[in-house]
Amino acid sequence: MFFDREEEIERLLEDISYEPNMVTFVYGPINSGKTTLIQEFLKRTSEKYVGFYINFRKTPVANYEEFSRVLFSFDSRIKMIKDVISILGKVNPWIPIPREVLNDILRDKEPINAFSYLREVLEEIRSSGKMPILVFDELQVIKDLKVNGSLIYQLFNFLIHLSKEAHLAHVFAVTSDSLFISEIFGNAKLSGRASYFPVYDLPEEKAIEFLLRLNLSEEESRLVVEYFGGKPSYLVEAPKHRKHLREWCERELTLRAREIRRFKSNLLLEFMDEEEVEVEELSEEAINLVNANILFYDPLRGTLRPQGKLELLAIRKVIKG
């Protein structure tokens, strides 16, 4: 469910009004609404754009064949590259491909072949007078996949070529993995070739407005925000628990505190009085808490903070005992 991200939508639409020049990484805390935002953005693009939304969460990706099958889908209507244009919609969940070309890509296990076909499709789209937009959601899923070296860095090099060098397509990579973003941010090869677009939880007043639109009362809305802040996933769930709203809020807090209590971490003590702390580098302790989705690391700001308001309250509950 999409609500009041107009400022972010306008920024994204403005970005694509210029010639492609960067790979844009869309990142933020878990369940902050990144996927919903990017899908709404694609819907709102004009007819001069063709979107591809590739979701690496929709199926396990443990090898090159599975990667290729997420990226491409066989379509019997395609005999030649130029046939692709006639079957594309405004937003497409994969890149259509002739069966024999897909078979060759799967057989050869050479990423360059997959990338070459994708480039040909994008060139055909540009020749038709339209601009492609490539979106890869949860790209970090393939970060450990090896195909003649690191697949993800081969993909990054290709995406940089598409955007910064060939100016063939706007490219977005979406992730909730802040350690992955930290690696990207610290990669010298991506310096000057990547931009970063943070998506945080909704501000509390906007969250209350959202809940009021879901027919919760002012009092009920403020209660939900008191526990969950502007975390969209909890805001959407709240109306289902309206009959026992406070009990639901307390139960979620208790469960989260129980999970956090397993971590004997002195680092968490810093959040007793602070909502965000600056860090020069991530300790092993911090990495474990980020991996457990308790803390969120923002490499652009150089800060650590709880993944959401519920985590902040749970941390303080654990500290107080």
UniProtKB/Swiss-Prot annotation:
One of its GO terms (molecular function) is ATP binding. ATP binds at G28, P29, I30, N31, S32, G33, K34, T35. Keywords: ATP-binding, Nucleotide-binding. Transmembrane segments: none annotated. It comes from the Archaea. InterPro entries: AAA+_ATPase (IPR003593), Archaeal_ATPase_domain (IPR051667), ATPase_dom (IPR011579), MJ1010-like_2nd (IPR049081), P-loop_NTPase (IPR027417), WH-like_DNA-bd_sf (IPR036388). Belongs to the archaeal ATPase family. This is Uncharacterized ATP-binding protein PH0541. The lineage of its organism: Archaea, Methanobacteriati, Methanobacteriota, Thermococci, Thermococcales.
